[in-house]
Amino acid sequence: MNKLLIMKKLILYTLLLFVSFSYGQKKELRNANKFYTSGEYSSALDLLDSSKSLFDSSDDKIKSQVMLLYGKIHTSMEDFSLAIKAFDMSRNMGISNQILSPELSKLETAIITSAVGDNETENFSEAAKKLKMVYDINPEINQEYLYYAASSAVNSMDYNLALEYYLLLSDIKYEGIETKFYITEVASGSEIEINSETEFNLLKKSKDYSNPRE
């Protein structure tokens, strides 16, 4: 009888310990999400990092949510390579495509916007790397961004990198761009050609550009 009582107490203790850990994990994740939502990205990141040992003992469902939040934070902080890694880990841990896909779309838009800025300031080397990231996120859909990455690599005079990208384009049998987009720079009055519909849609929203056309 005593053994049965001891066993029941052990089971109860283990259950309480599990519930306590689970509550603690969810509480820290909620708090980190609050920091993120309020735009306090560094605080959200610090809280996740300081709670690493707590999250390490969690199940994959919690871990996938933690990595998703890491990805969202790094996207907002423009740490794009870290964001990609975090989202990949979240996917591998079982996060649903319904939850992940919108975040990947936001990441793609953020990277493209940053690359557009790099090209405008003639930082072609960084633009090439970022556009390659967009391709890597979804190689089946984003093949055109590998083409843009190669073009930026040429502009940066990194011909070895450009050749690497062009050879990859050949390997995937990229057939080129069919639709051309045009928009006028307000400052110069010059019309420029835009090959990306996403970039075109972003520039249309800018006061620095006018007269968009296809």
What is the predicted function of each stretch?
Residues 1-10:
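Positively charged n-region of N-terminal signal peptides that target proteins for export
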Residues 15-23:
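Hydrophobic h-region of N-terminal signal peptides that target proteins for export
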Residues 23-112, 120-121:
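N-terminal leader/linker segments that initiate helical-solenoid repeat arrays
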Residues 26-33, 63-72, 101-117, 148-151, ...:
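Amphipathic alpha-helical repeat scaffolds of TPR domains
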Residues 55, 94-95, 131, 138, ...:
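Alpha-helical junction/boundary sensor with strong preference for TPR arrays
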Residues 75-95, 154, 159-177:
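TPR/TPR-like (Sel1-like) alpha-helical repeat modules
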Residues 137-145:
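Alpha-helical tetratricopeptide repeat
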